[in-house]
């Protein structure tokens, strides 16, 4: 000892005297680099499903659209899509409104816009036929020169304007916009079969031909309605006979006669030069001007034309279009269904002293010579002039943004899975998808979507939501494919074989035949005795009973009853479970819903954070982690109960079906019918029980998922156990006593839960993961897990109340119902008890050596030392304490 003291003193004299507050460069080193390297472990989000959405514009119909997601073979793929964003394109029409003296009402030429061909179509126009012999596709225009004087053509024209021309249909709620346009908008090359691409006109007289050219020359979108007197007062007020103006007479007897009478008959009131001269001398009529305004003027902005929808006037004759800059339009929202009609109450009749109407010509004349003689001999001086035209575009949209059911059926969605991300060719056909599609992916690869076969008159975006399962499926594969499915398949086969053997058994057949005979005899005797009041329902019921029992003993009995009756129960369990479950890993695996659950609760990050909390013994987080882990184990046991409940229910159904021949025979008689009814109720209870159990289980699982994320907190790399180096030399009579921490190693580094201390600001804030919030959340999590563990007993009671099928009582205990699932779980617990006890040994060692720190037991007087055996009695416990414990 003296030598040691001397060495220490020598060192102290050699080095500089050290003080408690002195520091050295090596002490300033820190492990912040490690902290930055490991960072923090965040609480994971449960993302077993990869979800996203895409909007497919109908303008890209037929083209595959990438989702950017990959799918795995055999895993769930869900696609939901909606056409809520799809609306009808505005219906577009080009309308040419023209006054022709040969027709009592205005001529209306209508073109319809075809969105699929991106052009207007002049449909139903008379005397246009496709020229199949021509090298240039198109149509032959109406023949105005050859065979022009044709009563047949006149008849066709009359019918066309009367009822055969294209109609513009308007529905209530439609928004109608009508705008005036130039003739160049109407006569365009983008017209089906090149019909009405140019003005229809002829330089010769053709009484039966149709014309579109303006009869006011270059002055378009104008109407003239003026008496001969007003016209002549403008162009020849003096009535000079030396001027070939065409005017004659004065006052009300004034007449106007075109130099070329033949052209006047087909809608040309004046020679082109005279028309231009006249139009240059007059002005636009004042607002709200009526007929025969003085002096003569022209009507524009839609005046002189009446527009109706379903008989309701939407623009009066004297009403002008709204003018905005260079545009003139009228806007209207329809209040009723109907046909849009362009007309006027200004009459063409009596423009000439003799009729120029086509309808009169074909009725009055039998041949062309008499018609020509009529034309040449009569005076065709006009009493008034009524000519002009309007060119318009009509756009009709639906204010409700709705599309018809027929249009909806033409919108389809397809999906395609490819091995690489290369854009598939549009010619490749995909798999059709309904509005709520759910199936297993047929192969691995990239997911593509597209819209096909949309109508040409719709626009908008098809909204598609899609999701695919990305978690593991090992548990359901083991449980269902490895255990449950072999059992259910075996019991299906057993049920079928047992049933067939029963109906082929001679004793069973004799019982069935005897029961039928006895039933008919009793029925006949009761009928003869008059004790039976027969109704139509009673007769039908008895006949059905006899037919069912008679069919029961036939060879095709199993095929018939299994198809139309037994399958309701055997497939009903799977059907209800499949439709109740929302999230599942596979549609073909009815227990696929367990995979997302196990994927959540076996997440490595979750258990890693729980392990980190287990290390926090000093602040109580270890207790919270223990509660959470025990709760999860309890919940896993509840999952096992659900699986066992399904197996027992299915076995019960198959056993009841195998005994069906006995119970079906019992339905004949009233005394035994109750057994048949109980049999049906039992079958129904077996179907309902796993369904209700699963519903409750999934509801609790939703709550558990939220609570688990609150129990587990993020952990960051920090000091787990602080390390302090102390130096105390007072025992050596040296006045030195201090301690310090090494900056580069202040303690044992590891992840530490990020839990704030409780203070006034967060004590009542549930969003802050304080110790109080964690503790209460852990207790709630434990309570919910206990609820899931007791679901089987609760569901048995509920099903018993619904179906009147009460579980059997435990022998010697009338109050307690027997629970097959509980019995199975108890047997499993008995088998696993040794394993559980063995697993508790390390925990006992940890408690005894670390927490209680009982390294060596005290020796009793006259006793022996501690045996060091785990299950031996403690020697450090007095007999008095043992008595208290006992």
Swiss-Prot record:
Transmembrane segments: 520-540, 563-583, 609-629, 647-667, 680-700, 771-791
GO terms under cellular component: plasma membrane
Cited Pfam families: TrbL
Cell compartment(s), UniProt: Cell membrane
Family: Belongs to the TrbL/VirB6 family.
Protein name: Uncharacterized protein RT0029
UniProt membrane topology term: Multi-pass membrane protein
């Amino acid at each position: 000892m003296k030598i040691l003291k001397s060495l220490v003193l020598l060192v102290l004299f050699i080095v500089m005297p050290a003080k408690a507050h002195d520091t050295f460069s090596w002490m300033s080193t820190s492990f912040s680099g490690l902290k930055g390297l490991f960072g923090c472990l965040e609480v994971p989000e449960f993302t077993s499903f990869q979800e996203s959405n895409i909007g497919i514009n109908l303008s890209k119909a037929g083209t595959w659209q990438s989702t950017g997601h990959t799918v795995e073979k055999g895993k769930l793929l869900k696609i939901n899509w909606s056409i809520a964003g799809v609306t009808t394109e505005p219906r577009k029409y080009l309308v040419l409104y023209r006054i022709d003296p040969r027709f009592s009402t205005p001529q209306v030429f209508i073109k319809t816009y075809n969105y699929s061909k991106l052009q207007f179509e002049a449909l139903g126009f008379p005397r246009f036929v496709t020229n199949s012999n021509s090298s240039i596709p198109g149509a032959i225009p109406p023949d105005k020169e050859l065979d022009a004087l044709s009563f047949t053509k006149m008849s066709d024209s009359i019918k066309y304007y009367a009822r055969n021309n294209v109609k513009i249909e308007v529905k209530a709620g439609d928004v109608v916009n009508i705008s005036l346009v130039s003739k160049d908008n109407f006569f365009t090359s983008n017209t089906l079969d090149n019909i009405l691409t140019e003005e229809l006109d002829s330089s010769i007289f053709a009484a039966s031909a149709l014309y579109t050219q303006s009869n006011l020359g270059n002055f378009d979108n104008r109407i003239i309605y003026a008496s001969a007197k007003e016209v002549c007062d403008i162009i020849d007020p003096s009535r000079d006979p030396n001027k070939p103006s065409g005017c004659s007479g004065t006052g009300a007897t004034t007449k106007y006669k075109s130099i070329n009478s033949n052209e006047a008959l087909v809608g040309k009131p004046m020679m082109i030069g005279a028309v231009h001269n006249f139009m240059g001398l007059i002005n636009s009529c004042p607002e709200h001007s009526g007929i025969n305004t003085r002096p003569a003027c022209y009507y524009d902005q839609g005046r002189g034309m009446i527009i109706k929808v379903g008989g309701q006037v939407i623009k009066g004759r004297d009403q002008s279009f709204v003018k905005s800059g260079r545009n003139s339009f009228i806007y209207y929202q329809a209040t009723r269904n109907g046909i849009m009609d362009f007309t006027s109450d200004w009459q063409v009749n009596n423009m000439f002293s003799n009729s120029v109407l086509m309808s009169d010509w074909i009725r009055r004349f039998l041949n062309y010579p008499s018609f020509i003689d009529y034309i040449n001999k009569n005076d065709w001086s006009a009493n008034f002039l009524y000519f002009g035209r309007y060119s318009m575009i009509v756009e009709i949209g639906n204010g409700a943004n709705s599309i018809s059911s027929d249009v909806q059926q033409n919108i389809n969605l397809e999906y395609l899975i490819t091995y690489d991300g290369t854009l598939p060719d549009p010619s490749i056909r995909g798999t059709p998808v309904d509005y709520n599609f759910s199936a297993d992916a047929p192969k691995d690869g990239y997911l593509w979507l597209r819209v096909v076969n949309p109508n040409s008159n719709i626009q908008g975006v098809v909204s598609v939501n899609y999701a695919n399962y990305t978690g593991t499926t090992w548990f359901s594969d083991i449980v269902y494919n490895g255990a449950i499915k072999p059992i259910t398949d075996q019991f299906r086969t057993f049920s079928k074989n047992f049933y067939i053997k029963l109906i082929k058994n001679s004793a069973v057949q004799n019982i069935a035949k005897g029961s039928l005979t006895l039933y008919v005899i009793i029925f006949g005797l009761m009928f003869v005795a008059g004790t039976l009041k027969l109704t139509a329902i009673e007769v039908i019921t008895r006949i059905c009973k006899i037919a069912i029992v008679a069919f029961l003993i036939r060879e095709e009995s199993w095929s018939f009853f299994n198809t139309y009756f037994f399958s309701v129960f055997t497939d009903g369990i799977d059907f209800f479970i499949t439709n109740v479950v929302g999230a599942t890993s596979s549609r073909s695996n009815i227990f696929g819903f367990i995979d997302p659950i196990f994927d959540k609760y076996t997440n490595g990050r979750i258990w890693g954070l729980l392990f980190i909390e287990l290390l926090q013994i000093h602040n109580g987080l270890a207790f919270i982690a223990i509660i959470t882990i025990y709760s999860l184990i309890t919940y896993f046991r509840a999952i096992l109960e659900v699986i066992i409940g399904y197996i027992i229910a299915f076995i019960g159904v198959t056993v009841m079906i195998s005994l069906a021949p006995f119970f079906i025979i019992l339905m004949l008689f009233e005394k035994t019918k109750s057994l048949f009814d109980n049999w049906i109720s039992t079958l129904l209870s077996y179907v309902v029980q796993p369904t209700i159990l699963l519903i409750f289980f999934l509801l609790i699982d939703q709550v558990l998922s939220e609570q688990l994320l609150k129990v587990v907190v993020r952990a960051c790399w920090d000091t787990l156990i602080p390390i302090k180096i102390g130096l105390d030399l007072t025992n050596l009579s040296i006045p030195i006593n201090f301690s310090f921490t090494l900056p580069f190693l202040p303690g044992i580094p590891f992840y530490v839960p990020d839990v704030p201390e409780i203070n006034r600001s967060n004590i009542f804030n549930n969003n802050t993961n304080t110790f109080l919030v964690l503790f209460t959340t852990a207790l709630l999590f434990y309570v919910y897990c206990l609820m899931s563990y007791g679901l089987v007993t609760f569901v048995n009671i509920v099903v018993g109340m619904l179906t009147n099928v009460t579980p059997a009582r435990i022998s010697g205990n009338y109050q307690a119902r027997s629970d097959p699932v509980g019995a199975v779980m108890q047997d499993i617990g008995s088998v696993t008890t040794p394993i559980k006890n063995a697993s508790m040994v390390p925990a006992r060692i940890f408690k005894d050596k670390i927490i209680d720190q009982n390294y060596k037991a005290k020796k009793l007087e006259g006793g022996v030392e501690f045996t060091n055996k785990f299950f031996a009695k403690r020697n450090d416990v007095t007999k008095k304490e043992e008595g208290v414990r006992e």
